[in-house]
UniProtKB/Swiss-Prot annotation:
The gene is miaA. Catalyzes the transfer of a dimethylallyl group onto the adenine at position 37 in tRNAs that read codons beginning with uridine, leading to the formation of N6-(dimethylallyl)adenosine (i(6)A). This is tRNA dimethylallyltransferase. One of its GO terms (molecular function) is ATP binding. Substrate binds at residues 19-24. It is an enzyme of class 2 (transferase). SUPFAM superfamilies: P-loop containing nucleoside triphosphate hydrolases.
Length: 316
């Protein structure tokens, strides 16, 4: 698409970044100044009843800056990148029709990628193939299957943990059904996003600062009642660790504690470590992202001003 064609497209803003980087605070600040409406891009914030452990914006924040695509699924339900793209495009069209600008904020990089580039069609699940994979896992262990994935699709294997059976199984299933790797298929773009997008990433300049913020926030969540929140989910009886909701960072570790698998101190340690690993993966995604403008979260006023400088012309 030519620059002239792009300039004629409606405008949108992406505000991306690792967990605990200050994305929400900046987005709320920007809404006070720019004619924007916020759309959440977060695979955990979609779930109802999962507020503390996901650092969901609180009532006051949502009154100041309503977020779309929050609380749209029960924790028992699945939600795919394709679901997100469909829903986000509908919300973006609604915002644009009202004469405002969509500001998409979050840290689920796969959702941003799906929205920006489109999705290639993946083969539907095959119960027979899935059963064969699960049988092999029962006999040889998921570590063995992870090594198998590493041989055929090292890129996906680097992204998928051996202790993530659902994603590991799906990656192998796609290969067995189609003969093509998940990486090959997901790199085949579908329909590109019909918007002129200004992309920003916010993070502390120092990784150590981000690690400190992650640890502080995890302890703040615990002090705010995170354990009680997960106990309520645990008590439902219909939720389990094969669900994407319960595999969310923090929830998986608290679940293990409630099941008596680990001590409280071990839960805290694992929760902090898992959150740091998530942040590392998010930053790795962003380092390879094209056309992104980096912001320093330790200088919030400067970050705000940089966004305004880049996108200020579109606010008129």
């Amino acid at each position: 698409m030519s620059d002239i064609s792009k300039a004629s497209l409606p405008k949108a803003i992406f505000l991306m970044g690792p967990t605990a980087s200050g994305k929400t605070a900046l987005a709320i600040e920007l809404r006070k100044i720019l004619p924007v409406e916020l759309i959440s891009v977060d695979s955990a914030l979609i779930y109802k009843g999962m507020d503390i452990g996901t650092a969901k914006p609180n009532v006051e924040e949502l009154l100041a800056a309503p977020h779309r695509l929050l609380d749209i699924r029960d924790p028992s339900q699945a939600y795919s990148a394709a679901d997100f793209r469909r829903d986000a495009l509908a919300e973006m069209a609604d915002i644009t029709a009202a004469g405002r600008i969509p500001l998409l904020v979050g840290g689920t990089m796969l959702y941003f990628k799906a929205l920006l580039e489109g999705l290639s069609p993946l083969p539907s699940a095959d119960p027979e193939v899935r059963a064969r994979i699960e049988q092999q896992a029962a006999e040889q262990g998921w570590e063995s299957l992870h090594r198998q994935l590493q041989e055929v699709d090292p890129v996906a294997a680097a992204r998928i943990h051996p202790n993530d059976p659902q994603r590991l199984s799906r990656a192998l299933e796609v290969f067995f059904i189609s003969g093509k790797t998940l990486t090959e298929l997901t790199q085949t773009s579908g329909d590109a996003l019909p918007y002129q997008v200004h992309q920003f990433a916010i993070a502390p300049a120092s990784r150590e600062l981000l690690h400190q913020r992650i640890e502080q926030r995890f302890h703040q969540m615990l002090a705010s009642g995170f354990e009680a929140e997960v106990r309520a989910l645990f008590a439902r009886g219909d939720l389990h660790t094969d669900l994407p909701s319960i595999r969310c960072v923090g929830y998986r570790q608290m679940w293990s504690y409630l099941e008596g698998e680990i001590s409280y101190d071990e839960m805290v340690y694992r929760g902090v470590c898992a959150t740091r690993q998530l942040a590392k993966r998010q930053i790795t995604w962003l380092r390879g992202w094209e056309g992104v403008h980096w912001l320093d979260s330790e200088k919030p006023e400067q970050a705000r001003d940089e966004v305004l400088q880049v996108v200020g012309a579109i606010a008129g």
